[in-house]
């Protein structure tokens, strides 16, 4: 299905929880505890069926930290039939669940790992965890075939300095892609960095442009060790023109854009749910451009993860 601007909606990001076991300095939720508003696995199954009815082909599960949900496996099983089901995670619990996730039908994962420097990692995540926990999770994901594993790195003046070491730590693993993500908004105690800063820190690379989806190409580079590096600029260039996704919040509301306010969806009548989704998609606009002069973090609260 296409919206009024001719963009085909092909994917949905579902935030299954706002709970998190970290309090990352750049996260707009900062580990905030929600009320009892999370949808059940069955309710997610119903919403996903409605998404399939309007032509959505890919599902990305986000949070919060999705692995905190005890019924995550059931949610993944309810996504059967889509072309791709992926998961965004901080990775610290991934080693324990990778096998079950793969068996349930998960195709691949995005894992957040901004640095392998232990002190800096704890400063960024404000947690008791270590980069070693995340690396074990990445290794387990690769072993279970949840590839390509995209390793998300939020760029700051400090994480840029540790990028070469991070690449060295992961160099022996196949099936990885590094994503250099420019942060949205300010980061307390840190100076944001640009993708070009990260590329310079990585040293020699050979540029190759790779079209990753219709309407949209991101710069992709290949390091001398063969690892692909993808540049993600969330609010730059043709972001809105290229957008082919919709979002559903942890409490079952629709967002046509990360920056948009959530809209309610019917809970009881499935036909009405499908009709409402179609109407929301049909009238989807370039919300970022509309709200360019407002607070980024203010527009993002109420979720859905931008990772």
Curated annotation (Swiss-Prot):
Query: What InterPro entries does the annotation carry?
Result: Aldolase_TIM, Elp3/MiaA/NifB-like_rSAM, MoaA_arc, MoaA_twitch, MoCo_biosynth_MoaA/MoaC, rSAM
State which residue ranges cross the membrane. none
Keyword Iron, does the record have it?
A: yes
What superkingdom does the record give?
A: Archaea
Return one GO MF term. Answer: metal ion binding
Q: Which pathway does this chain act in?
A: Cofactor biosynthesis; molybdopterin biosynthesis
* Reaction it catalyzes: GTP + AH2 + S-adenosyl-L-methionine = (8S)-3',8-cyclo-7,8-dihydroguanosine 5'-triphosphate + 5'-deoxyadenosine + L-methionine + A + H(+)
- List positions binding [4Fe-4S] cluster 1: 20, 24, 27
Binding-site positions, S-adenosyl-L-methionine? 26, 64, 112
Show the Pfam families listed in the entry. Answer: Mob_synth_C, Radical_SAM
Keyword hit for Iron:
yes
Name the residues that bind GTP: 13, 60, 150, 245-247
Cofactor annotation remark: Binds 2 [4Fe-4S] clusters. Binds 1 [4Fe-4S] cluster coordinated with 3 cysteines and an exchangeable S-adenosyl-L-methionine and 1 [4Fe-4S] cluster coordinated with 3 cysteines and the GTP-derived substrate.
Which residue numbers delimit the Radical SAM core domain? 4-222
The UniProt record lists the EC number as 4.1.99.22
Requisite cofactors = [4Fe-4S] cluster
* Assigned keywords, A-Z: 4Fe-4S, GTP-binding, Iron, Iron-sulfur, Lyase, Metal-binding, Molybdenum cofactor biosynthesis, Nucleotide-binding, S-adenosyl-L-methionine
Q: Where does [4Fe-4S] cluster 2 bind?
A: 240, 243, 257
**Gene Ontology terms describing biological process:** Mo-molybdopterin cofactor biosynthetic process
Outline what the protein does: Catalyzes the cyclization of GTP to (8S)-3',8-cyclo-7,8-dihydroguanosine 5'-triphosphate.
What PANTHER family does this protein's entry cite? MOLYBDENUM COFACTOR BIOSYNTHESIS PROTEIN 1, MOLYBDOPTERIN COFACTOR SYNTHESIS PROTEIN A
What family does the database annotate? Answer: Belongs to the radical SAM superfamily. MoaA family.
Instruction: Tell me what this protein is called.
Output: Probable GTP 3',8-cyclase
Q: Which gene encodes it?
A: moaA
């Amino acid at each position: 299905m296409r919206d009024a601007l001719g963009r085909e909606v092909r994917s949905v990001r579902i935030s299954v929880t706002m709970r998190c076991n970290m309090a990352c300095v750049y996260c707009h939720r900062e580990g905030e505890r929600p009320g009892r508003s999370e949808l059940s696995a069955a309710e997610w199954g119903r919403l996903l069926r409605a998404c399939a009815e309007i032509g959505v082909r890919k599902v990305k599960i986000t949070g919060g930290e999705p692995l905190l949900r005890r019924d995550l496996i059931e949610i993944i099983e309810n996504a059967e039939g889509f072309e791709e089901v992926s998961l965004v995670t901080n990775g610290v619990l991934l080693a324990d669940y990778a096998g079950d996730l793969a068996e349930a039908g998960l195709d691949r994962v995005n894992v957040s790992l901004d640095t392998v420097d232990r002190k800096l990692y704890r400063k960024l995540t404000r947690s008791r965890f270590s980069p070693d926990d995340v690396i074990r999770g990445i290794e387990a994901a690769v072993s279970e075939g949840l590839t390509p594993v995209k390793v998300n790195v939020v760029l700051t003046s400090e994480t840029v300095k540790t990028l070469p070491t991070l690449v060295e730590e992961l160099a022996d693993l196949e099936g990885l892609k590094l994503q250099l993500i420019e942060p949205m908004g300010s980061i307390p105690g840190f100076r944001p960095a640009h993708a070009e800063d990260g590329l310079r820190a990585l040293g020699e690379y050979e540029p190759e442009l790779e079209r990753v989806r219709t309407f949209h190409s991101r710069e992709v580079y290949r390091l001398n060790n063969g690892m692909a590096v993808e540049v993600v600029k969330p609010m730059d260039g043709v972001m809105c023109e290229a957008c082919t996704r919709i979002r559903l919040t942890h409490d079952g509301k629709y967002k046509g854009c990360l920056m948009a306010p959530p809209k309610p969806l019917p809970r009881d009548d499935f036909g009405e749910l499908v009709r409402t989704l179609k109407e929301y998609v049909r009238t989807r606009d370039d919300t970022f451009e509309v709200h360019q002069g407002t607070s980024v973090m203010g527009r993002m609260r109420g979720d859905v993860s931008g990772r």
